[in-house]
Amino acid sequence: MQTITIHGRRTLHGSIRPAAAKNSTLPLLAATLLCDGPCRLRDVPRLADVDTSLALLDAVGARVRRCGADLCTRPADRLCGDIPEHLAGAMRSSVFYLAPLLCRVGYVRLPLPGGCRLGPRPVDIHLAGLAAMGAEVELEGIAVTLRRTGPLHGVDFTLRLPSVGATMTLLMAACCAAGQTVLRGAAQEPEIGDMIAFLSASGADIQGAGTPVLTVQSGRPLGGAFHRPLPDRIAAATYAAALACAGGQIEIAGCDPASYDSFLRFLAGTGVQVSRVGDCVRLARDPAVPLRGGAHLRADAWPAFATDTAPLAAAVLLTAAGESEIYDSLFANRFACAAGFAAMGAACTVRGRQLTLPGGAVLHGTDVTAPDLRGGAALLAAALAADGETRLRDPGHIPRGYEDLPGALRGLGAEIS
């Protein structure tokens, strides 16, 4: 079993620049299937989920290759609508291939997608929207099959929840549907804006970016585009959480502070010094001065506190003075990392979707297991504040979303092997 070893109580110093966002890159790779011309995604990080996406694209017949740090695609001669089960089960983002393959092939079969075990993550909004556009939907045990007998058609559709994944799926489908599509109650996360930017650069006519109502006027094929995915705001928040846990002074460059503003405001409330200059954030903390607790956070859809940063906030609050609570309204099992926190000496409790942190914990190194992607990153951050050596076992989730997170933190002064 792979293990990451962290020696705590080392302050962080230096500058770091987040790579392209995982949550943008993965759906953009699926969207390249819609294009009649070549596409190039620039500066794509080497993540496990990116490698899985490349294998999936190859399996369905797409033409994709690495061009240095970029990913280059060309229109395929022929695509297949059957997504292999082992690839679908390896990542949640396999759901993004529903719309492109349905549009291109007329048929797609997707085994239930995998990823982190965060509780129920239904695809019903994706399927309801595609059905409204004319897709025939068949659920068969562990797989879903979609067919169309003619072109998809535009629709006025209201999402029952502002799902990021469903919004992206329906945007892609709308670009191929005949006529006008209006999506109401759409997600507004920055990654939605990035998808719209890519599709628009490829020739799509999309209005309403940054609002909950998106209008897509179809009618012309997508030609393809060269596009740089936006920087990873969750990685930026992870580096910021690491600084808050370890102390020191760092600069996070090249990632719009507005994209992770809720997390920066949270850190400022705990006593971390936060300053913003253009696309740079400077953070400083004296590890001899206790952080302030008493936080009451609710993770929800944008622009609320981001669900992916909830475990990171928990790591910061473990040692802070005062009881704090974090509630995640999106994922039922978001706080699986609490078992690791408890093993390190924090008397935290989970009831339903709420994590309660008494604060003031004195953390000590021990063996902990990474339960999921963000929970694993949170345990790594917490270990930076612990006395002694922490061994993070089974950290395989972490490379799915971070390009060498241990190496990035080592570059800032952490002692990690």
Which residues make up each language-model segment?
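Short, structured segments at the rim of ligand-binding sites
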Residues: 1-417
